[in-house]
Amino acid sequence: MKKLFLTLVIVFAGIFTANAQVWLGGSVSTVMSKDTKSFEIAPEIGYSLTSVPLTFACAADFVYIKSETPFREGTGLMLTPYIRYTIASVEKFSVALDAMGQFGLMDAEGYRVGLRPIVAWMATKHWTAAFSVGFLGYDKMNYEHGAFTLDFETAAPRFGLYYNF
């Protein structure tokens, strides 16, 4: 317990001493169709590795998902570490690409790896709104019927809001 507490102190000390390099926020996504109902919320923390227009960043989010599909029903928790590469920035807008992996924790079994495009708008010095649609990659979830997919999903856009320190 002491080691965990010390680790958390060091992590938060690093976060609060980093100037304009850390963001904190999250995103939400929902899918409603005839056969599928899904809702996910994903709190997130990230760190910019460079501060030039073409930036690299690393981050992770914890996804809480509740879904009802013909193959599966229930809730789960997933960890999504990713590296973000900002491709272009024009005034307050930027386009980025996340190279991500998503791993199931607890009841959510399986994993997925791939690319996720992001469009972000920096509303103020500290607040950024982001929009993401699509995922191109490999998806292996442990459904009853054993689904392996390589997909470009456009059904579940994600909307995020981030505070930049």
Residues of each region from the PLM?
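Outer-membrane beta-barrel "beta-signal"
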Residues: D151-F165
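Transmembrane beta-strands of outer-membrane beta-barrel pores
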Residues: V28-K34, L49, A60-K66, I87, ...
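Repeated loop/turn-to-beta-strand initiation elements of outer-membrane beta-barrel proteins
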Residues: V22-L24, V52-F56, V90-S94, K125-A129
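Helix-adjacent hinge/juxtasegments
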Residues: I65, P70-G104
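Structural signature of outer-membrane beta-barrel channels/translocons
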Residues: G46-T50, R84-A88, G104, I118-H126, ...
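Sec/Tat signal peptide C-region and signal peptidase I cleavage site
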Residues: I15-A20
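Hydrophobic, lipid-facing positions within transmembrane beta-strands of outer-membrane proteins
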Residues: F39-P43, L77-P81, Y111-P117, A155-F159
